[in-house]
Amino acid sequence: AGRTLSKNGPHSLDIFELAIKINLIGTFNVLRLAALAMAENEPNETGERGVIINTASVAAFDGQIGQAAYSASKGGIAGMTLPIARDLARNGIRVMTIAPGIFKTPMVAMMTEEVQASLEAQIPFPARLGDPAYYAQLAQSIIENPYLNGEVIRLDGAVRMSPK
C-alpha cells in the first residue's frame, strides 16, 4: 500500500506492479487454465461445462487512500468478468465474480477488538463482519443458478468504504 505521491516521492512502481501481478494476472492465469480444462467437460443437459467464480473486493469500487494498486488489481478482476463470460459462452462456461466487503479473516482476527468494532460500525446492515459461510452460500447459489453469468456481485452488507 502507498499513496500515489507522498513526502518520500511517488508510489513505488514495483509495489504497484506486484499487486497487479498477484491479484489480476494471477486470477487471469488460473481462470484461463481452468477454462481450458472445463472446455473438455461433457456438457450437462443445458449445455454448461462449468462455472468460474473469481474474487474481487469492494475496493474495486470504493478504494481508499493508499489503495491504488490493490483497487486497480481488484477492479481489473471485476472489469474482465463480462468480456470473459462472453468469450467463454461458446464453450458453455459461465464466469462470475464476488466482491466481498469486510469479512472475518485471519488478518482481521489479528486486529484489536477496538479496530474490529470500528470496521463493523461502518457496515449498515447487518452491522457485523462477513462470515466466510456467507461467501460459500453465495458461491453455491451462483453454481446452482444457470442464468447467473457475466456479473459482479457485491457481498458487503451495503458498506461503502470511506476515503480513509
Language-model-detected regions and their locations in the chain:
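Conserved mid-core segment of classical short-chain dehydrogenase/reductases
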Residues: 1-17, 40-46, 66-69, 109
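Catalytic Tyr-X3-Lys loop
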Residues: 9-29, 53, 77
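Active-site helix of classical SDR
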Residues: 31, 73
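Alpha-helical segment proximal to the catalytic Tyr-Lys
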Residues: 36, 85-87
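Residue(s) in the substrate-gating loop at a strand-loop-helix junction
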Residues: 57
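Active-site loop immediately N-terminal to the catalytic Tyr-X3-Lys motif
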Residues: 62-68, 91
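Short, flexible catalytic-loop segment of classical short-chain dehydrogenase/reductase
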Residues: 95, 99-110
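C-terminal helical subdomain
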Residues: 97, 118-157
